[in-house]
Swiss-Prot record:
It comes from Escherichia coli O81 (strain ED1a). The MdtABC tripartite complex confers resistance against novobiocin and deoxycholate. GO terms for cellular component: plasma membrane. It is a multi-pass membrane protein. It is found in: Cell inner membrane. HAMAP family: MdtC (MF_01424). This is Multidrug resistance protein MdtC. The chain crosses the membrane at residues 3-23, 333-353, 360-380, 387-407, 431-451, 463-483, 528-548, 853-873, 875-895, 897-917, 953-973, 984-1004. Induction: The mdtABC operon is transcriptionally activated by BaeR. One of its GO terms (molecular function) is xenobiotic transmembrane transporter activity. NCBIfam families: PRK10614.1 (NF007905), RND_permease_2 (NF033617). It comes from the Bacteria.
Length: 1025
């Protein structure tokens, strides 16, 4: 009593307290960062190593395995995968959430150092690492194009000047430059000319290496001067290399230009990048795991003018893709939804109270509670994201509930003739415990979410804390500011209502009277109501089991990512043509704004494409609908597949897959894995629950297997090293020398001119100089035959692995797909030597599925404990919790009606309903207990009176919560696919619970009262409890 009086009779102090809360919230709002979702990125580090010319199997056994054994000892590694292809190995380390990325990076470097002695001596450089997830979509893509400069020169500008500068920007984790390679002098040898001159490829290599030398020459010095010695020992351009004498034949000089074509070109000609059908260099920028995407993008944009000033005017630097506009648009949509929710909630209050003066009170309480929450969000290190803003939107209905309960009770006393200040004090005292019970029990719902681990726990923590803080501030405001404003603003008379609102008042009275009559009938037919309640419980269980489930709603971020997978024996020239063909098909799509792509490198048969769609306001279809239409057109392209998927804000794992979800096969028996993977993949491809089924196992690449005749080699004076050196010199794009320039280092690359390697007959033109100086053709001591060979070798942990990726067809959920995969694996009878498990997002979904029911039960148990403590009763909490089954049925039926799968967002809605719908029962039970204690009423009379007296606030609070969530259901635009499942769940649950709990709660109350009387020794205890 004194607590309430302290604020009611000191209006200045109460107003200033509310102003302080509001100002703190405004300050916090201005400092809060912006993000699409809470920070849920796993710390990921990528280790890269190269050994030019080495086969995938050689890279896996000699490079990947030693590194994996060393890296696997690092603490906190939750997953380690590797992929070895021609000349390169990449190892992805995913760490636990609580692992500091910088500390992990130090451990990675130490592990690399420890494994260095076990690595091949021919590696051109030590393994390196990057603090970025290669499977993440870039947050920004920059392109360089020019009509003047070559691709190699553009790549040089990008890698030498732009990439290092961008990498230094806060939040940037990795800048991957693609589309070409560094400039180089390429020596294309003519094998016939070499044979005619008696010059071996090793002779050419040695001559070039010896002619381009950078060594210190020392200095000359006398008594007064010092001269640094400088020579022309370096060759820098193709023109300088052409006249180089490499051999003397019969006294005549054989120059390099006589036996080779020397050009200024690039290190690796098997790379191509394009933007909108124009050759381009791509800078793909990825953020650090802990970085904020909006702040990082803004920082990059702020540096762009400076970057443009460092490159020639003839080079065009453009932003091809930027993830931030759709994120900003999505958050603007949520903010608009929040404003609409506030307006609708205040409108509900006005319609019920029919007084502008009374409506002002909750109209003040709601903004104070919501704005004050921003200060707590800032102190907790949160961000303004879709989930935290959705929490505030839903909180609109909650925070007004407290004010409504207090205001409505005070207004009831005023209408009875009580003076305003007395009515404020008396009304607040009567419902203070009710408001406290409603708020604490609602916050209790979120305690299991706060204790939940893993990615779901991190994802939902900001939502739960934000909503809990808003409810806490609302509780304070409703017990301080609201009664003070009621006492000083409201008058002791019935509200003067406008004529147009009298109809609503009469309708409300008629509705209350009708409810009273129906309630009397229900209280005389309690068994029927009990059967209905039991039926809702059973229906809940059936609906939950049968409803399709997924991890997170599929987002339309306006960005698509595509992986190209072609025949494993395809040439680079043909692959570049496929890239161009796919880009043309996509550019013809009206909804596409920009498309970039690249191919080449160590895996010639693969490529990547990044597609930016037009803003949602400029297209009528969702990203998934566009993918479905493009899928049919792309399927007509022979010899290659382009698998498209919408970029999501949540992606788990470090695998670079061509689809959204993965299923990984593991085995310690590589032969068994290679036998069963194609069978499993083909089986999964036939399932209607899956689309775009593909695999990273590529073991059917074309290989030419050379078989040496060692006896013949010994007789001819040739050793294996000389023969292998010949092949590397001829076909391996061998880097034989280094050209040093002020800004970078470039290579001299030697190979047989591609004009002479168009078919297998090129091997017949190769020869080795033996120990007697004679040219011995390769065909004299070797035979060759075509064979199959892997293009890549993949590991997970220390086991051989193969990952099958898939997307979901329209209308299918992740639960449908996972169940279908489990059935297929059982039908195939896969041996125990091959183990299958879901990976990435699909794995998190499986883990979440296992904990959902436990989470809901824990929330209900927590609410029961809190209510039991507040009411000092084992029974009354059960009465209050009896409202939940009807809400669950309504929520699940609504999801089914809208064809929305049960996702993590829908789970939030279920958890919220646990807190919302019990408010009705709390108001009924509180007033019924009060009537029994002080009104000497029977339990049936007490609960009947409580239901009628609290009918108006129950309707007000329910409609306020419903209208607060309704904009989420009706919202469109960016991010609506995240908001709608939450709104659908809440609105469906509220409608169903409102229809049933007005009748089931009094019946359950009387049932437990009779039960308590039956087992009680003192019947009066039922009244006094």
């Amino acid at each position: 009593m004194k607590f309430f009086a302290l604020f009611i009779y000191r209006p200045v102090a109460t107003i200033l307290l509310s102003v302080a809360i509001t100002l703190c919230g405004i300050l916090g709002f201005r400092m809060l960062p912006v993000a699409p979702l809470p920070q849920v990125d796993f710390p990921v580090i990528m280790v890269s190593a190269s050994l030019p010319g080495a086969s995938p199997e050689t890279m896996a056994s000699s490079v990947a395995t030693p590194l994996e054994r060393s890296l696997g000892r690092i603490a906190g590694v939750s997953e380690m995968t590797s992929s070895s292809s021609l000349g390169s190995t990449r190892i992805i380390l995913q760490f636990d959430f609580d692992r500091d990325i910088n500390g992990a990076a130090r451990d990675v470097q130490a592990a690399i150092n420890a494994a260095q002695s076990l690595l091949p001596s021919g590696m051109p450089s030590r393994p390196t690492y990057r603090k970025a997830n290669p499977s993440d979509a870039p947050i920004m893509i920059l392109t360089l194009t020019s009509d003047t400069y070559s691709q190699g020169e553009l790549y040089d500008f990008a890698s030498t000047q732009l990439a290092p500068t961008i990498s230094q920007i806060d939040g940037v984790g990795d800048v991957d430059v693609g589309g070409s390679s560094l400039p180089a002098v390429r020596v294309g040898l003519n094998p016939q000319a070499l044979f005619n001159q008696g010059v071996s490829l090793d002779d050419v290599r040695t001559a070039i290496s010896n002619a381009n030398v950078r060594k210190p020459q020392g200095a000359l010095e006398d008594d007064t001067h010092r001269w640094q010695i400088q020579t022309n020992d370096e060759l820098k351009t193709a023109a300088e290399y052409q006249p180089l004498i490499i051999h003397y034949n019969n006294g005549g000089a054989v120059r390099l230009g006589d036996v080779a074509t020397v050009t200024d070109s690039v290190q690796d000609v098997r790379n191509a990048g394009m933007t909108n059908a124009k050759p381009a260099i791509l800078l793909m920028i990825r953020k650090l795991p802990e970085a904020n995407i909006i702040q990082t993008v803004d920082s990059i944009r702020a540096r762009l003018p400076e970057l443009q000033s460092t490159i020639p005017a003839a080079i065009d630097l453009q932003i091809a893709q930027d993830r931030s506009p759709t994120i900003r648009a999505s958050l603007e949509e949520v903010e608009q939804t929040l404003v609409i929710s506030v307006a609708l909630v205040i409108l509900v209050v006005f319609l019920f109270l029919r007084s502008g003066r009374a409506t002002i009170i909750p109209a003040v309480a709601v903004p104070v509670s919501l704005i004050g929450t921003f200060a707590a969000m800032y102190l907790c290190g949160f961000s303004l994201n879709n989930l935290s803003l959705m929490a505030l939107t839903i909180a609109t209905g909650f925070v007004v509930d407290d004010a409504i309960v207090v205001l409505e009770n005070i207004a009831r006393h005023l209408e009875a003739g009580m003076k305003p200040l007395q009515a404020a004090l008396q009304g607040t005292r009567e419902v203070g415990f009710t408001v406290l019970s409603m708020s604490l029990s609602l916050v209790a719902v979120f305690l299991p979410l706060l204790l939940m681990g893993g990615l779901p726990g991190r994802l939902l923590r900001e939502f739960a804390v934000t909503l809990s803080v808003a409810i806490g501030i609302s509780l304070l405001v409703s017990l301080t500011l609201t009664p003070m404003m009621c006492g000083w603003m409201l008058k002791a008379s019935k509200p003067r209502e406008q004529k147009r609102l009298r109809g609503f008042g009469r309708m409300l009275v008629a509705l209350q009277q009708g409810y009273g009559k129906s309630l009397k009938w229900v209280l005389n037919h309690t068994r029927l109501v009990g059967a209905v309640l039991l039926g809702t419980i059973a229906l809940n269980i059936w609906l939950y089991i049968s409803i399709p489930k997924t991890f997170f709603p599929e987002q339309d971020t306006g960005v698509l990512m595509g992986g190209i997978q072609a025949d494993q024996s395809i040439s680079f020239q043909a692959m570049r043509g496929k890239l161009q063909d796919f880009m043309k098909i996509i550019r013809d799509e009206p909804a596409v704004d920009n498309v970039t792509g690249f191919t080449g490198g160590s895996r010639v048969n693969s490529g990547m494409m990044f597609i930016t769609l037009k803003p949602r306001g400029e297209r009528s279809e969702t990203a998934q609908q566009i993918i479905d239409r493009l899928r049919k057109k792309l399927a007509k392209e022979p010899g290659a597949n382009l698998f498209l998927m919408a970029v999501q804000d949540i992606r788990v794992g470090g695998r670079q897959a061509n689809a959204s979800y993965q299923y990984t096969l593991l085995s310690d028996d590589l032969a068994a894995l290679r036998e069963w993977e194609p069978k499993i993949r083909k089986k999964l491809a036939t399932l209607p629950e899956l689309a775009d089924v593909n695999s990273d196992q590529e073991d059917n690449g074309a290989e030419m297997n050379l078989i040496y005749d060692r006896d013949t080699m010994a007789r001819l004076g040739i050793d294996v090293q000389a023969a292998n050196s010949l092949l590397n010199n001829a076909f391996g794009q061998r880097q034989i020398s280094t050209i040093y320039q002020p800004m970078n280092q470039y290579k001299v690359v030697m190979e047989v001119d591609p004009r002479y390697t168009q078919d297998i007959s090129a091997l017949e033109k190769m020869f080795v100089i033996n120990n007697e100086g004679k040219a011995i053709p390769l065909s004299y001591f070797a035979k060759w035959q075509p064979a199959n060979a892997p293009l890549s070798v993949n590991h997970q942990g220390l086991s051989a692995a193969s990952t099958i990726s898939f997307n979901l067809p329209t209308g299918k959920s992740l639960s449908d797909a996972s169940a279908a995969i489990d059935r297929a694996m059982t039908q195939l009878g896969v041996p125990s030597t091959v183990r299958g498990s879901f990976a990435g997002t699909a794995q998190v979904f499986q883990e979440t599925m296992n904990s959902q029911v436990i989470l809901i039960i824990a929330a209900i148990a927590t609410v029961y404990i809190v209510l039991g403590i507040l009411y000092e009763s084992y029974v009354h909490p059960l009465t209050i919790l009896s409202t939940l089954p009807s809400a669950g049925v309504g929520a699940l039926l609504a999801l089914e009606l809208f064809n929305a799968p049960f996702s993590l967002i829908a789970l939030i809605g279920i958890m919220l309903l646990i807190g919302i719908v019990k408010k009705n029962a709390i108001m009924m039970v509180d007033f019924a207990l009060e009537a029994q204690r002080h009104g000497n009423l029977t339990p049936q009379e007490a609960i009947f009176q409580a239901c009628l007296l609290r009918f108006r606030p129950i309707m007000m609070t329910t409609l306020a919560a419903l209208f607060g969530a309704l904009p989420l259901v009706l919202s469109g635009g960016d991010g609506s696919e995240l908001r709608q499942p939450l709104g659908i769940t809440i609105v469906g649950g509220l409608v169903m619970s409102q229809l049933l709990t007005l009748y089931t709660t009094p019946v359950v109350y009387l049932f437990f009262d009779r039960l308590r009387l039956r087992f009680s020794r003192k019947p009066k205890q039922a009244v006094t409890e």
